[in-house]
Amino acid sequence: MAIFGSKGYKVSLRGRSGVLYKEDDRRVLIDAEMLTGSTNLVIYFDRLKLWEEPRKLITREEREKIRENVTSELEKHGLVIEWD
């Protein structure tokens, strides 16, 4: 498991099928899939609905922040990602 993070959040790759995002006391596991070819990882953004802890809806603003932070960290480490 690779862990990346800065500025109050952490992004972890969870095997070949997920990205764990942690921010303060909240966390969410985002469905993803490792690929071969020009794209390394596809992340299923539409499935991002609820924080795991605490169980609360993720707002539109939080979704965009999560997307920006995950993209920034993974691309910084050389991964080519696609959001679906």
Task: Provide a role label for each language-model segment.
Residues M1-G18, E23-D84:
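Cysteine-centric segments in proteins
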